[in-house]
Amino acid sequence: MFITFTENVIELQEWSTKKELIYSLSQCDLGSILLNEEDDYEQKFYAAIVRPQTSGLHYFGIGICSEGHGLKPNLLINPELDMIMFGYNKEVVGVNLKNRQIAFRIKLNSLFYYFLPLKNQGIVLIVQEVDITAITELGKEIWRYGKDIITQTTIEGEKLYLNFMDESPACLNILNGELVRV
């Protein structure tokens, strides 16, 4: 599968073994980054191969060693910043495509589920198994909230409604993470 944004084409790949992933990344003449390579429980292997359209047939690769858990890594593209955020295992990593470097890394308290980008507020909500973390588009943490296993998220204006498995629902202000009375 290919994704095109700004001056880049991204090919998403899945590999059966770490050896295959490393070989694929070794073919990237513009360099590569391997995320979570030190994990002892890696089970699944993914890559995003980036080809800047202005540089001909040259490639930059980002590989992910995932623990499996039944959750595939997610990526969130921010064309204005030329950045890709990767969410996997218990981590979110932002990669700057201009300088091909890790821009930020955020450790999570529980398994990553998905991103909720809020462009108008310049905020990205990171939904995890039992937490929500709000960050800026540049990766600066704004707030965290955790209570129980999250079963549903709903956004209305500047309010984030959360349903939990065994706890009562909560409503948070998206901008500061404070509880809001409903």
Regions found by a protein language model. Give the residues of each.
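Extracellular-facing segments of soluble proteins and assemblies that are Gly/Ser/Thr-biased and enriched
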Residues: 75-106
